[in-house]
């Protein structure tokens, strides 16, 4: 009994010492953060995601928002493109709480579609454009979005894999294609037309055969009138995105995130970096995929929250990154160790 009591007392004493140690460690860390200018708390989110773009365009209208392989879009231009895309979505019957399926690599159209959907209170369901056809079909079934905006190459691959859009789970849906070359610099677009092997290879990397019945999202969005500025904003408590888990413990699952969830993540990240970043002066490399929580939070959201320039790369490649660096060096590079 004595030994037992001694053991319990020792364990209790050890636990208390550990708790005290943890508490003192937390206080020490907080002091370090405070010294670095990182606040211990941040204000609660009061506005939806689209207001981040509104504020950046208002304060830095002429700053480059997007650099896509050398073609640039200012914040003023981006805001206008988003307003047109938002009205285009409304014309397709998309409204508050409706799901828009997005199957795109990192590209200007991805940024525009996401902020357009958020502006009108729609939910962005993100999909990996390289995911297997069966996995995508299951994800379409889960969210039941009526509008799908997809990369041409993904649509071509799905039809090649299963035979038709219907077999891919897209039957009866409004499916629109995105041409990645549309936002290249003019010189690059013209070079793609050259009858040489290098041009053909690059065309195959960027574009794909569009299945019958699929219309151009690029044309639709460009021809739409801008959304009225007074159009009501969604509440921060409303759903904004469906992101799919990695599937390491089974079938990927859809995780629903609200405007408050996503913007809180962004605001906390910006608070962490507040001592080393300046609004309107940073250059982010958007290499992490937007369809992943990491890429969405630190590139699609944080960069806009800082009115930063995003150097948007459709995939990671050392050659692409180094070429971009010569043109526009990064000040902020969210990445993973292998990069």
Language model: regions and residue ranges:
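Conserved structural elements of the adenylate-forming
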Residues: 79-84, 224-227, 255-276, 287, ...
């Amino acid at each position: 009994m004595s030994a037992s009591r001694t053991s319990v007392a020792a364990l209790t004493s050890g636990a208390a010492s550990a708790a005290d140690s943890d508490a003192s460690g937390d206080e020490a860390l907080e002091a370090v953060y405070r010294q670095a200018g990182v606040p211990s708390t941040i204000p609660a989110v009061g506005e939806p995601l689209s207001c981040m773009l509104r504020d950046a365009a208002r304060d830095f209208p002429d700053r480059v928002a997007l650099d896509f392989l050398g073609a640039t879009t200012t914040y003023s231009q981006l805001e206008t493109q988003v307003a047109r895309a938002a009205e285009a979505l409304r014309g397709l019957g998309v409204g508050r709480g409706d799901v828009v399926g997005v199957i795109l690599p990192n590209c200007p159209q991805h940024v525009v579609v996401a902020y357009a959907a958020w502006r009108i209170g729609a939910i962005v369901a993100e999909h990996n454009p390289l995911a297997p056809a069966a996995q995508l079909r299951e994800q379409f079934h889960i969210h039941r979005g009526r509008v799908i905006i997809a990369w041409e190459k993904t649509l071509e691959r799905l039809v090649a894999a299963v035979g038709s859009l219907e077999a891919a789970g897209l039957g009866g849906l409004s499916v629109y294609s995105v041409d990645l070359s549309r936002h290249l610099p003019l010189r690059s677009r013209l070079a793609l037309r050259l009858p040489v092997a290098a041009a053909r290879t690059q065309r195959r990397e960027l574009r794909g055969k569009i299945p019958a019945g699929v219309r151009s999202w690029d044309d639709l969005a460009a021809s739409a009138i801008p959304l009225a500025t007074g159009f009501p904003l969604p509440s921060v408590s409303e759903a904004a995105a469906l992101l799919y888990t990695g599937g390491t413990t089974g079938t990927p699952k859809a995780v629903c995130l609200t405007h408050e969830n996503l913007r809180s993540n962004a605001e906390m990240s910006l608070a962490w970096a507040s001592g080393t970043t300046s609004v309107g002066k940073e250059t982010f490399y958007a290499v992490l995929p937007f369809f992943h929580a990491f890429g969405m939070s630190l590139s699609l959201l944080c960069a806009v929250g800082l009115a930063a320039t995003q150097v948007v790369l459709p995939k990671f490649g050392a050659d692409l990154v180094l070429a971009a660096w010569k043109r526009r060096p990064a000040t902020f590079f969210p990445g993973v160790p292998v990069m």
